[in-house]
Amino acid sequence: MARTDQGLGAESEPLTNQSHRHSNSFSSTDSLSTDGSLFGDDMNATQFQKSTQLPEETPYRDIEEGVEGEPESDILSHPRDKSKRSRGSRWIWVIGLLCLGGWILAFILFWGRRNNNSDISSSVAAVHDAESATGATSYGKPLTLDSVLNGSWGRRKHSISWVAGPDGEDGLLLERGEDGKKGYLRVESILSRQNETDADDGLILMESGTIEANGKYLQPSETWPSPNFKSVLVAVDAVSNWRYSFTATYWLFDVKTQTAQPLDPDAPKGRIQLASWSPNSDAVVFTRDNNLYLRRLDSTTVTQITKDGGKDVFNGIPDWVYEEEVYGSDTATWWSNDGKYVAFLRTNESMVPEFPIEYYMSRLSGKHPSPGLEKYPDVRKIKYPKAGAPNPVVTLQFYDVESTDVFSVNVSGGFADDDRLITEVVWASETKVLVKEFNRESDVVRTVLIDVGSRSGDVIRVDNFAQDDGGWAEVTQSTTFIPADPANGRPDDGYLDIVVHDGYDHWGYFTPVNNSQPILLTSGPWEVVDTQPAVDLRNGIVYLVATKESPTQRHVYSVKLDGSDFQAMTDTSKAGYYDVSFSIGGGYALLSYEGPHIPWQKLVNTPSNQQHFEEVIEQNEHLFSMIEKYALPAEIYQNITIDNITLQVVERRPPHFNPIKKYPVLFWLYGGPGSQSVDRKFMVDFQSYVSSTLGYIVVTVDGRGTGHIGRIARTIVRGNLGFWEARDQIETAKAWAKKPYVDKDHIAIWGWSYGGFMTLKTLEQDAGQTFQYGMAVSPVTDWRFYDSIYTERYMHTPEHNPTGYEHSAISNMTALQQNVRFLIMHGTADDNVHFQNTLSLIDKLDMGGVENYDVHVYPDSDHSIYFHNAHKMVYDRLSSWLVNAFTDEWHHVGSALAAT
């Protein structure tokens, strides 16, 4: 299920972010060859940051370990001018001192009344007043909902489009901008950013932001240079298809002549679904009308590779469910490293049932109806396999570029056609490819090594999670090939993969490739993050991101391929959330600090590169000016232990928090398997608005089933989604209801997508005992309505687990009737969580005589709810509905009497 993050308007974004399919950005994913550790033997992230002398930061709103307002080390500080501080006036100090005495008295009274909860372990040693909790921000004005929704609080984050130089040059990046003396598209050395006056303009690939073809000027939608920088693949007039996929007309742009020609001269207007360069820059493979084609650059002839593509058969691209739930992209074509073979997925969905999506206000198909039919809805039918329905049948095929043969390789002992998922394809050498196959319920994984030269294959590893712990295998795209290098102590090929060790996800190094027992690179009661690691091949060093310090944090670490010398590359003495990306050759790195303080990004040279370089590329100065204008809530990170499982909690307290006052509490959650909502990222979102402006406490707990807490806590939810997760929300709410500053009669819960399901499931399970209100947006209400690959991973098939599906569905109308009131909102054109879910629930509510709920429907909106101002309307409705709940307005509505 693609997540919809309820932050900074992110509820409007589907659960996974969109990505450009041919992006040249490498985020901790590339094989490196460096001469040393990332920041040097004596250079950790703190030292790296200090060399820039970034100015001091105003303390932000994160409270940890009872110390708030204490300046972080430079690694956590944000560049800003001290002169911008404007709240040190004499009168404020006088008033502050007067208030301090009153606060101390209130503080003593509060602690005298406080109930000790043995099941809660808080990282806050004391309750802080608003000033100490939020620093200068508590003196500002309340947040506005518009400022949250319009992106004013969005953090700017840059991705570096690193590109490999044709002759092995490192530190090259792709720049795309406006027309000018430097050109529209150019390859630039990172060193040119350091001294722009002396540096050249790099290699200009496209001088203008338009291309002339057939007497017309065309505007590029996307551009992808060839590996040798002599040509550019240009997509024009891109039209979105599903979450990641789109179609466009494609052109080959010659850098030398600055002229363009159609990718397929015989079909210049043909809508192409996917195109990608050969590693040798001599050919482009592309999919059109679900068939695969090859265009060599030394000819205008296009070779058709497949001929069976059509309505039910896809070649080289995924269908809806594989794009959504397996690859997270529109790509199912993989060139071999030497450009002699193309691996591609063939998908046959002829047995997959169609689901109709109706559009009442718009024409997504682009077709104009015949006269007299204008008032009928536009209907789009999507092959959507629901739980228990037939899945698409997938096979991996190969194309030999020289012989033009198309073939597949049968490996004995495989899964049946209706029980096979192909989840990952990684070329391991010029002729060998690693393939991961899952069974339908995603609890048995076969790793297969295929040799396309001999057209043979072997199963090199089988992981049976059903037997091991009763859990599931998550789909990953992070397997990394490690080539043999006897001179550097690697006699055999190998690969990195995430393995389960003592109940936690860790990196393992399998060498030789057919070895089923890995060298453990990491271990311990914490987990690595599922992103491809960067590898220094010369020195045998792996760079990775992990949660070693806390599930809510991300730090960068290095470890040798033999599992020794594990080191932190960022400052782990302070709470932090980091990301990192490396240049192709490993000479440069982009370190991104994402929280809890103001995010920043910095480029540096790594020790393998003796030429010093460092540049702060993003400081997010606008956020500093924003936090000085607005009062923001304090964020207090805590732990709660339920059934001997420790869970992460964050409590957002309103500015000027008064410990002797009673506050309503809103719980916000997502809660899907493997997800995370409690983290140390900087975020000002709808929850911040609710706390800052509406004055309510907002609590989030990552319950069982969520990510980075170990498999025991994660996999317990299998087969009965919603039960344990709802219990964790209820038990946490009970603990908060006992707090002296909480109004236990005004506790609500809300969420979107899986969070919408969890909202309803929690209200159903609690039956009004703890929660009185709930707001569910785009909720799943019965897992038999959701797609098969996601659902069966966590629930098994309906045939295997009919009781589990019955229990997980929202079905107890009597229990829902015990709540004061709840709200349901859904887009009618939701192609992810179908509107059918809400309609089915409403039918149950009608049959049960339940009336204590409201429904808001958004015509033609998909899962993100954006169409025709719907995005703003969602949050306006959430906000006003919540105010009515916490001011007892819904009590009056619920007991309304007929006029006499």
Curated annotation (Swiss-Prot):
It catalyses: Release of an N-terminal dipeptide, Xaa-Yaa-|-Zaa-, from a polypeptide, preferentially when Yaa is Pro, provided Zaa is neither Pro nor hydroxyproline. It is an enzyme of class 3 (hydrolase). The keyword Cell inner membrane does not apply. The keyword Hydrolase applies. Residues 112-900 are vacuolar. Residues 44-55 have a biased composition (Polar residues). Residues 1-90 are cytoplasmic. It comes from the Eukaryota. Glycans are attached at residues 150, 195, 348, 410, 514, 639, 644, 812. One of its GO terms (cellular component) is vacuolar membrane. The active site is at 753 (charge relay system), 830 (charge relay system), 863 (charge relay system). Belongs to the peptidase S9B family. PANTHER family: DIPEPTIDYL PEPTIDASE 10, ISOFORM B, PROTEASE FAMILY S9B,C DIPEPTIDYL-PEPTIDASE IV-RELATED. This is Probable dipeptidyl-aminopeptidase B. It comes from Talaromyces stipitatus (strain ATCC 10500 / CBS 375.48 / QM 6759 / NRRL 1006) (Penicillium stipitatum). The gene is dapB.
